[in-house]
Amino acid sequence: QYDEPSSALIKMYLAGEFGKDPEKVSPYAASTFYAVDRYASYERVWKDYYQKGGVMLCDRYTTSNAVHQGGKLQGQAQAEFFTWLYDLEYDKMGLPKPDLVLCLDMPTELAHLLREKRDTQGVGDRDIHEHAERYLARCRETARLAAKYYGWTLISCVKDGQLRSIEDIHEEIYRHIAACLED
């Protein structure tokens, strides 16, 4: 959706126009940027398809807001944020709740090495999140906490200290999706 008008505030946020440190940008404000963009996408692009029984597979959704913005908070403030976020997006905005959430879990250090490799290959630009290693480590912990709290399925991208192959991770993802569709 980055080419749509509804993503303007997201682009500004990720470019650092509200501050270069993601932790200093209100998680409530940043979450609202993403929520409004999701709402616009739902209403304009996929609502009819979904309501007719279509299956949607989303790479990042409300759950990504829970991880990236919830990672800015701790303890009771984080729990209150999760409640607020889900109320905003699912109850007030009417976005569909996911039937299945798969969270790819990778140690922050390995993710950093993969980003550096991507940088040397000239693939993509880093956003303000990708420049903040401590923030990303906290996001990983938030994802693991949220997975337990909400019943998400964690998929480890590492086995015996080594990165799993894309094909191996794909097969595990496929199994979970197939099982969900059978229900």
Where are the model-predicted features located?
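ATP-dependent small-molecule kinase phosphotransfer cores
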Residues: 1-87, 91-93
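Short loop/turn elements that form and flank the Walker-type P-loop nucleotide-binding site
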Residues: 51-52, 96-97, 148
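Hydrophobic/aromatic beta-strand patches that form the interior of the parallel beta-sheet core
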Residues: 57, 100-102, 153-155
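A glycine- and Lys/Arg-enriched "phosphate-lid" helix/loop adjacent to the NTP-binding pocket
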Residues: 63-141
